[in-house]
């Protein structure tokens, strides 16, 4: 890691472990919070406010992650830290082991039950997003994060769009141009339709499901025209009415040129052992007409994910998500930056410099539920259990607890030592909802630690007044001030330590590195960069080559 890549005030707060990836627009590290010990992922966006488009994308992603961060299948944004140059920005996320794209490229790693579990959690996240009238617009395997317990987190909301501020009807939901991964684009996006619906996400989910079943992308087009060709020779051809409903100016011409190509079915693209219900769900998601595709709520009731279906855990918002800046308003890049920092500082209730302390995104205040200790890994063939999470904070009553709730789950409230993250403590004599007089029992093998309650400001002032002592200078002991009658602390006295004697091992460490392996000799230490997955069974499997978008 180059020291110049991380600002000093960020390195003081987070201990950088290793670099996870780097691209043209940013770099991601695995790090540890020095205050709490929590492992996090830090994403540095280069020149996040270089122009109006990049500034708007950064603004949308942060605002939407603050809205959706309490959902168990959406990545949590923990902190926002401006860079020293006022151009870059650091986003601090919870850490995950890998992503679905890396898992698929490992080969036949996922069993059928894992595929069902992963797709069910993706549907849960998509339903929650769509209930707020937000479209992700960039769902693909690389944006689906996983851990060894088969937990799913949807990330990268940079291309997401809120429809809450737009008028109803096709005229209000105008389709703007955006650069998303071609292999997962819906036909209406490829045909430059004048409007769109949440069906664009459902098409992308169908492509993700097909890639999990097949082991490689369903439609790996090399251009927009080739992408349409692969789609139209696989799915049933649309009617003229369906083409007219898209509002595309040249969709009929494209269909005329591509409609005469030989057809193949989805069955021919998938392995012969594909479950029939998986194929049925895939066909219902990959419909050409957006209004004929299943919604996320309908797909959650499909037999393919029936064993995981639980309405109490499939949350929905009761109101639309409305961004602080109207979707129709176009601000300049400096205005987006100023507005972003102003909003987060106002919501955190703190006026400190964001460059020194971070902006303290309030998404970390969501109540979480600890995962059970006996969670199965991806390598096991046992049915993965989707954790029953605490409902996200939203307007309206909370949904009742699932009948299948695991009693060993322990409800915790995440707090940080940073005052920007702290929740207001309960009043005198109050306890948080659901708290009892005794601390909750921890799972076996977990060492619990009980800390004494910190004294209040009143008790501290009384103790200070009662223990006041006359302070005088003691020139015989170095001239420092000392309290009369106070006992001297030996650790503060000058210590006359003996001079260190040379020992056997006081020589250059490079002498012994050659016998400790090539990795340690070359790198000065054992690096985790040799594997893409940490603390899981995924890293032991060979990497199979596969196409990438």
UniProtKB/Swiss-Prot annotation:
Residues 483-492 have a biased composition (Low complexity). Transmembrane segments: none annotated. Residues 1-20 are annotated as: Ubiquitin-conjugating. GO terms for biological process: DNA damage response; dopamine uptake; endoplasmic reticulum organization; negative regulation of cell migration; positive regulation of cell population proliferation; positive regulation of metaphase/anaphase transition of meiosis I; positive regulation of spindle assembly; positive regulation of telomere maintenance. CDD domains: STKc_MAPK15-like (cd07852). The keyword Isomerase does not apply. The modification Phosphotyrosine is found at residue 178. SUPFAM superfamilies: Protein kinase-like (PK-like). Gene3D superfamilies: Phosphorylase Kinase, domain 1, Transferase(Phosphotransferase) domain 1. Keywords: ATP-binding, Cell junction, Cell projection, Cytoplasm, Cytoplasmic vesicle, Cytoskeleton, Golgi apparatus, Kinase, Methylation, Nucleotide-binding, Nucleus, Phosphoprotein, Repeat, Serine/threonine-protein kinase, Tight junction, Transferase, Ubl conjugation. PXXXP motif repeats lie at residues 380-384, 387-391, 395-399, 403-407. It catalyses: L-seryl-[protein] + ATP = O-phospho-L-seryl-[protein] + ADP + H(+); L-threonyl-[protein] + ATP = O-phospho-L-threonyl-[protein] + ADP + H(+). This is Mitogen-activated protein kinase 15. It comes from Mus musculus. The lineage of its organism: Eukaryota, Metazoa, Chordata, Craniata, Vertebrata. The gene is Mapk15.
């Amino acid at each position: 890691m180059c020291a110049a890549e991380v600002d000093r005030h960020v390195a003081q707060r987070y201990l950088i472990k290793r670099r996870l990836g780097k691209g043209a627009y940013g770099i991601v590290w695995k790090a540890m919070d020095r205050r709490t010990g929590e492992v996090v992922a830090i994403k540095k966006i280069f020149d996040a406010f270089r122009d109006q488009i990049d500034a708007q994308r950064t603004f949308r992603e942060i605002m939407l992650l603050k809205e959706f961060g309490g959902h168990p299948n959406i990545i949590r944004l923990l902190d926002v830290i401006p860079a020293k140059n006022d151009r870059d920005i650091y986003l601090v996320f919870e850490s995950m082991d890998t992503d679905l794209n890396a898992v698929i490229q490992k080969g036949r790693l996922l069993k059928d039950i894992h595929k069902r579990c992963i797709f069910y959690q993706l549907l849960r996240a998509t339903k929650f997003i769509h209930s707020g009238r937000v479209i992700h617009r960039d769902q693909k395997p690389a944006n689906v994060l996983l851990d060894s317990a088969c937990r799913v987190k949807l990330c990268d909301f940079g291309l997401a769009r809120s429809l809450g501020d737009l008028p109803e009807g096709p005229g209000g939901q105008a389709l703007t141009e955006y650069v998303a991964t071609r292999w997962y684009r819906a036909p209406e996006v490829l045909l430059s339709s004048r409007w769109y619906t949440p069906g664009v996400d459902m098409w992308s989910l169908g492509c993700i499901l097909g890639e999990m079943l097949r082991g490689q992308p369903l439609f790996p087009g090399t251009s927009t025209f080739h992408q349409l060709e692969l789609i139209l020779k696989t799915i049933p051809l649309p009617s003229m009415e369906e083409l007219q409903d898209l509002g595309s100016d040249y969709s009929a011409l494209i269909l005329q040129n591509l409609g005469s190509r030989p057809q193949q079915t989805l069955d021919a693209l998938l392995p012969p052992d594909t479950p029939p219900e998986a194929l049925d769900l895939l066909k219902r998601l990959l419909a050409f007409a957006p209004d004929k595709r299943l919604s996320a709520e309908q797909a959650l009731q499909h037999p393919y994910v029936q064993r995981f279906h639980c309405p109490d855990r499939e949350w929905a918002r009761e109101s639309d998500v409305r961004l602080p800046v109207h979707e129709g308003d176009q601000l300049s890049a400096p205005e987006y930056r100023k507005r972003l920092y102003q909003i987060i500082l106002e919501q955190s209730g703190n006026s400190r410099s964001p460059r020194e302390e971070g902006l303290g995104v309030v998404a970390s205040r969501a109540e979480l539920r600890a995962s059970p200790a006996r969670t199965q890994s991806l390598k096991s063939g046992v049915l993965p259990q989707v954790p029953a999470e605490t409902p996200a904070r939203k307007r309206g009553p909370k949904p009742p607890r699932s009948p299948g709730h695991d009693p060993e789950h322990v409800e915790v409230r995440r707090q940080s030592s940073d005052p920007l993250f702290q929740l207001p403590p309960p009043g005198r004599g109050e306890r948080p909802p659901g708290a009892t007089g005794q601390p909750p029992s921890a799972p076996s093998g977990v060492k619990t630690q009980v800390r004494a309650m910190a004294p209040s400001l009143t008790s501290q002032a009384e103790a200070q007044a009662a223990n006041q002592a006359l302070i005088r200078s003691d020139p015989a002991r170095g001239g420092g001030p000392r309290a009369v009658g106070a006992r001297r602390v030996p650790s503060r006295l000058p210590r006359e330590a003996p001079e260190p004697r040379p020992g056997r091992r006081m020589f250059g460490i490079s002498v012994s590195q050659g016998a400790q392996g090539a990795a340690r000799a070359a790198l000065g230490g054992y690096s985790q960069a040799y594997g893409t997955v940490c603390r899981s069974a995924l890293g032991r499997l060979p990497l199979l080559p596969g196409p990438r978008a």
